[in-house]
Amino acid sequence: MKLTKRNPILVLVNDFVIDSPLPTNLTYFWNFGSLLGVNLVILIISGLTLAMHYTPNTLLAFSSVEHIMRDVNNGWLLRYIHANGASFFFIWVYLHIGRNLYYGSYRSPRGLLWSIGVVIFILMMATAFIGYVLPWGQMSFWGATVITNLLSAIPWIGTDFVLFVWGGFSVDNATLNRFFSLHYLLPFILAALVVMHLLALHQDGSNNPEGISSSSDRLRFHPYFTSKDLVGFVWMAILLSIFVFFAPYYLGHPDNSIPANPLVTPHSIVPEWYFLPFYAILRAIPSKLGGVIAMFGALLILFPLALIHTNNVRSNRYRPLLNLLFWIFVFNFFVLLWVGAKPIAQPYILIGQISTIIYFLYFVILMILGCIMTYIYTKSNCFFIYFFLYFGCSIL
């Protein structure tokens, strides 16, 4: 008997990496999960090494980052890999989510798998935000001030909660220490959630481009899909190397190369590029509380997708209307990303408000179209059709 069949630990590795059965028609769009796993390992290793030389003190944080860049052997390489690796991590995540939205991978029986993935997405956004504060540059300080101030919109306890997060009356040394501790801890929680994500995937099985069950037409993960994943790893290494060695600051903000100064406000306060779509949604609502609700709602609306999607057909490739709707949603997401980087002025405010409406309207139309198509295919009634008809007539 093979060693991989006898050792309890190697049995798990064998079940997940070698003998795991996967549908034969998986495309390169199913590479993003493995890319994310490798990227997370790179981020954790580079982050742990950087933490050995970083000083979480407002007077020394910026200087310690410069010390890493100038004095630590290959410190510049570690920092560039960590910073640009975080950007690539979000690129793979957005592509991963987009593929799941297109092919309906959130549908039963993968509801738990999808929910764990959304939790990972929200937690990694929190991890990235507090990590962006650590260099203690100008944009780090003011970004932390603006974003943490959003918590004051919570009724009754908002102001006290902000002071609790700050550890004082402003973003200062206590805040930086708290953020450093959390940024050190959260990646390991992320890794634990990733393991849960893999367990759920192993339990429910992977989706495929057809969106139908393929239990009888499967191949082993190794060597058929490991070779496919290796191609993705090579491309990721090439793309990441281009940014690390030739354009390390391209995805960052130049103001963060200036030490934090509480007395000088930057001309425009913007977060990292991967937060911009949700930052645009936040700014689109004039009310502070309304903006916070809309921003978090844009993330939390991903949880009930399995309930919103009422069509019996899982994949969008066989539904022309939903296919068109999906690509409108993708284009609108890029519009939100573009608007989020622009100053708060017209016409960007109006464009952001329209794009925000389109963002949420996608999920409403997804539900209505699903009901209509289900009725056409099966002649069965849908509760949501009656609900929206009643709601629309009530408004009129």
From Swiss-Prot:
Binds 2 heme b groups non-covalently. Keywords: Electron transport, Heme, Iron, Membrane, Metal-binding, Mitochondrion, Mitochondrion inner membrane, Respiratory chain, Transmembrane, Transmembrane helix, Transport, Ubiquinone. GO terms for molecular function: metal ion binding; ubiquinol-cytochrome-c reductase activity. SUPFAM superfamilies: a domain/subunit of cytochrome bc1 complex (Ubiquinol-cytochrome c reductase), Transmembrane di-heme cytochromes. The chain crosses the membrane at residues 32-52, 76-98, 113-133, 179-199, 225-245, 289-309, 321-341, 348-368. It comes from the Eukaryota. GO terms for biological process: mitochondrial electron transport, ubiquinol to cytochrome c. Heme b b562 binds at H82, H183. The keyword Glycosyltransferase does not apply. One of its GO terms (cellular component) is respiratory chain complex III. Its main location: mitochondrion. It is found in: Mitochondrion inner membrane. CDD domains: cytochrome_b_C, Cytochrome_b_N. The keyword DNA-binding does not apply. A ubiquinone binds at H202. It is a multi-pass membrane protein. Its cofactor is heme b. Heme b b566 binds at H96, H197. Component of the ubiquinol-cytochrome c reductase complex (complex III or cytochrome b-c1 complex) that is part of the mitochondrial respiratory chain. The b-c1 complex mediates electron transfer from ubiquinol to cytochrome c. Contributes to the generation of a proton gradient across the mitochondrial membrane that is then used for ATP synthesis. Fungal cytochrome b-c1 complex contains 10 subunits; 3 respiratory subunits, 2 core proteins and 5 low-molecular weight proteins. Cytochrome b-c1 complex is a homodimer. Belongs to the cytochrome b family. PANTHER family: CYTOCHROME B. Heme 1 (or BL or b562) is low-potential and absorbs at about 562 nm, and heme 2 (or BH or b566) is high-potential and absorbs at about 566 nm. This is Cytochrome b. It comes from Spizellomyces punctatus. The gene is cob.
